[in-house]
A protein has these predicted regions:
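Right-hand nucleic-acid polymerase module
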Residues: 1-151, 161-287
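Cys/His-coordinated zinc-finger cores
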Residues: 157
Length: 287
């Protein structure tokens, strides 16, 4: 097991972060605050430590659910890497980061729409199609600059390159992304070959938004706009052989995942559950 997804202690740490987050937004987004506050208050485990059942809220801003989603994606992406390497011997994985300029919160929603349209134009270009890529995985990440208060949306993409295929240089990718985004001021894209190691898989298994970016309180008044901007955005998008690998391995859409562990192959479920004690800030077992 590459990552420990069953640590009750880790759940408790993330739960504590979730309580702090919920307190901050309780006046600007009471419904979201309530969901995050009561997330993960009941957890059923197997005797070998797997999470068999839990009342996770599945909210993108919930630290507990973001952590669970991230570690499950890590394990799934690792299996996808292995499936693709076996299916297409000699293929390479290239990690591509596509950026845009930072925007204030009131422009974030329109910028995400523009980025989606830019990506479609990018992948429909004739010269892009001529690369003969086997598939890709595109992940959206949004970070917040604590000094300027601006938001930085960007795409992390893993391209699957067939054996013996030549790829253009960095300047070509930058020019194509500038044209697709219709913004000549974009000055940075990142392109590098990855090997399917732990560190490379982590890059495409990140949180959409990091709870560490919301440690202060300056962002609180912006939260309703941020929540609205991300409400109907697809953050995880596989294509080609990557989509095929997820189907073959039986993985579901990350936004629809129950976030519990797969206990269908065995593992006796304990005859008690852990309930969160808000006074002790800990999970206590009850029969």
């Amino acid at each position: 097991m590459l990552y420990d997804t069953s640590s009750l202690m880790k759940c408790q740490v993330k739960k504590y972060s979730g309580l702090n987050f919920a307190r901050k937004i309780r006046y600007v987004a009471p419904d979201v605050s309530s969901r995050i506050w009561y997330c993960g208050t009941s957890i059923g485990l197997t005797y070998d430590g797997l999470i068999a059942s839990a009342n996770f809220c599945k909210n993108r801003f919930c630290p507990t659910c973001q952590w669970r989603r991230s570690v499950k994606l890590f394990r799934q992406n690792y299996e996808c890497f292995e499936w693709i390497k076996e299916k297409y011997p000699g293929c390479r994985f290239v990690f591509l980061t596509l950026t845009v300029r930072n925007v204030p919160i009131d422009s974030l929603s329109s910028r995400l729409v523009d980025m989606s349209a830019a990506w479609n134009r990018f992948t429909q270009r004739r010269d892009f199609k001529c690369l003969g890529l086997l598939g890709w995985l595109r992940v959206l990440e949004i970070t917040r600059n604590s000094f300027t208060g601006s938001y930085h949306p960007h795409f992390h993409v893993v391209l699957v390159v067939p054996a013996g295929c030549w790829l253009p240089d960095h300047a070509w990718w930058l020019r194509c992304w500038q044209l697709a985004a219709r913004d000549a001021s974009i000055m940075f894209v990142n392109l590098r070959v990855v090997d399917g190691s732990k560190s490379s898989i982590e890059e495409v298994s990140k949180y959409v938004v990091k709870d560490s970016d919301f440690s202060g309180s300056a962002w609180v008044s912006e939260f309703p706009e941020l929540y609205k901007a991300l409400s109907h955005v697809r953050c995880f998008s596989p294509a080609g052989c990557w989509r095929d690998s997820r189907r073959a391995l039986g993985f579901v859409d990350p936004d629809k995942d129950s976030l519990t562990d797969d206990v269908s192959t065995g593992g006796k479920i304990q005859d008690f559950v852990y309930l969160y004690n808000f006074k002790m800030f800990a999970c206590i077992g009850f029969h």
